[in-house]
């Protein structure tokens, strides 16, 4: 807060000191990377390029953070996350004689996915820890995304074979087909539900993308479709309403189709974003806008979704236009169905397309 306040006032020396303290005393990698990245910006603003380079390189090592990915892009480095995203092949021969594995496969074949989840997790608890990476890949092959995610977070420490499992890529498709790039949809599903298809929030939001039944009902009515809340437990239906709502937010004047604002509206609703448009003095800087969002949950949500989105693009070996744009302090627009992103630089209220 102190650093950002000084930054807005143009006191970059005070901002540098504040951001340096954030980086040194951070309690987690996300906060440390943020302190390093903004410290690097302040170092450049105070004409200390050697300090800028040092801080950017340190931030880039925190490869699974929002600012770590931005730092790597700004330096022209291949992100560590892209190197790790290369998935090995499933070694079925080492698993095919394990009863719990055979049971899980059989259960998936008859549509009993929750029981299959239980069987694979039980095998992980009683089996050879060296098989966790293989079991994670099997969970992915069986479309057991929540269990694959579980392996990614509860597998052996520092095991890179399960790091990709933290970002499942299930073979699902919305009922109306993909109109929004899957990387962005899965980025939301990961944060909203950890890919649990039947989870219900205290507010009543349901399923993968935590869609509110009232929101889905309105979208269905506009299309002349029938709707039942229980349908949101089905991946294809939930993804359809989730992407439809993102499209609706994209087309609202208050978001301008800019990706960070669409993501913020998905979390907080359109009305707060409309208010922030007039209250936040971001000087055309998208990163300053994100850090100035007054709702701490939404502020963190935007960074997490973008981080997830970029890593999904890396998993699919795709370029990331939004990452490239934000690393140059430009506003990324909402991606098209192929994931292509255009960016715009906004300075003093003037929008210059690039």
Residue ranges of model-derived segments:
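Alpha-helix initiation and capping sites
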Residues: 64, 97, 113, 128-129
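Catalytic glycan-binding domains that act on GlcNAc-containing polysaccharides
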Residues: 5-14, 25-34, 46-51, 55-59, ...
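Tandem amphipathic alpha-helical repeat scaffolds
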Residues: 3-5, 41
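Repeat-mediated protein-protein interaction surfaces in helical alpha-solenoids
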Residues: 13-23, 76-89, 111-120
């Amino acid at each position: 807060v102190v650093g950002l306040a000084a930054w807005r006032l143009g006191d970059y020396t005070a901002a540098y000191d504040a951001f340096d303290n954030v980086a040194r005393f951070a309690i987690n990698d996300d906060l440390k990377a943020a302190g390093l990245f903004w410290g690097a910006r302040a170092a450049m603003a105070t004409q200390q390029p050697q300090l800028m380079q040092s801080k950017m390189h340190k931030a880039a090592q925190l490869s699974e953070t929002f600012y770590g990915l931005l730092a790597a892009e700004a330096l022209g480095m291949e992100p560590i996350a892209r190197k790790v995203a290369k998935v090995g092949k499933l070694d079925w021969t080492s698993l095919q004689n394990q009863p719990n594995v055979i049971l899980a496969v059989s259960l998936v074949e008859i549509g009993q996915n929750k029981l299959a989840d239980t069987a694979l997790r039980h095998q992980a608890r009683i089996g050879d820890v060296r098989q966790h990476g293989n079991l994670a890949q099997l969970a992915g092959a069986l479309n057991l995304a929540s269990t694959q995610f579980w392996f990614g977070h509860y597998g052996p420490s520092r095991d890179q074979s399960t790091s990709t499992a933290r970002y499942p890529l299930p073979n699902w498709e919305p009922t109306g087909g993909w109109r929004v790039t899957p990387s962005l949809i899965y980025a939301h599903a990961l944060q909203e539900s950890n890919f649990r298809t039947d989870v219900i929030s205290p507010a009543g939001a349901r399923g993968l993308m935590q869609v509110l039944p009232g929101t889905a009902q309105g979208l269905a009515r506009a299309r002349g479709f029938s709707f039942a809340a229980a349908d949101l437990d089905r991946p294809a239906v939930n993804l359809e309403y989730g992407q439809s709502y993102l499209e609706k937010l994209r087309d609202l004047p208050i978001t301008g189709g800019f990706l960070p604002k669409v993501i913020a509206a998905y979390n907080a609703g359109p009305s707060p974003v409309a208010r922030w448009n007039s209250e936040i003095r971001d000087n055309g800087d998208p990163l300053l806008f994100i850090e100035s969002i007054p709702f701490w949950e939404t502020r963190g949500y935007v960074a997490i979704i973008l981080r997830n989105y970029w890593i999904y693009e890396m998993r699919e070996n795709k370029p990331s236009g939004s990452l490239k744009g934000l690393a140059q302090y430009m506003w990324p627009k909402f991606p098209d169905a192929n994931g292509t992103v255009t960016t715009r630089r906004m300075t003093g209220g003037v929008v210059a397309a690039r």
